[in-house]
Amino acid sequence: MEYTISKINKIGVKIKESIALNSDEQEMFNYFRKIHELIFEKFYKKVNLSDKYTIVTRLKRMESIINKLQRPNSSKLSRIDDIAGIRIIVNNFNEIYEVSELLEKLLIGNNCQLKYNKDYIKSPKKDGYRSLHKIFTFNYENKNLNFEIQIRTKLQHLWSTTVEIYDLIEYKNLKSGSFNKLKTWEGLFFKRCSKVMENFEKEDFISSKKLVNKIFT
């Protein structure tokens, strides 16, 4: 199917404004999402990591794309970074940056470039989220498709997954909500747990113990 970036972005505007798409627009929207699967094929051809790492790929759900477009100050549809997402789970801090460097060596080339990094390891989000995000762009039929690779430790992944599960069980929105999460007891609890895990990974057991005592007393 032929598509242009201009048409894709117009579809994104209609979605943002909650205007129904016609059948041709819906088909183009579906196609634009679907072609991002090509990135996974290219990734596995170029990248062969050790079995000690866990690698997971996912294509962003249609509902999640729509929700992202309808947020305040959202990106254009063609510029969304994580329609194609790859997550690599490693064992410790050092491996995060080792894998990061290796990915750049293996992926960057004629049709793939690194756009930027978001280092939430060195600068965690206010809610305690920690991970290294690498945003790449892949050229397909003279059009750029963005994709995101997240690299995190097992403990960081445990924290993030626990937040998601809590959201599902309690019908909360701690993961992606735009409200001040730290004004809720749950948000403050998970932030402190993240700090405990960070100290533990840095082998700062004294600080970890003090913070655990603060959380549970």
Where do the PLM segments sit?
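Helix N-cap motif at beta-to-alpha junctions
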Residues: 91-95
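Short connector loops at helix/strand junctions that flank enzyme active sites
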Residues: 81-83, 129, 144
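Short Gly/Thr-rich strand-loop-strand
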Residues: 103, 108-139
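Hydrophobic side chains in well-ordered alpha-helices
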Residues: 43, 96-102
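An acidic, glycine-/histidine-flanked metal-binding catalytic module
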Residues: 1-37, 143-217
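Residue(s) in the substrate-gating loop at a strand-loop-helix junction
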Residues: 88
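Surface-exposed, low-hydrophobicity interaction/linker segments
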Residues: 24-71
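Short, flexible, solvent-exposed loop/turn segments with mixed acidic/basic and small polar residues
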Residues: 70-80
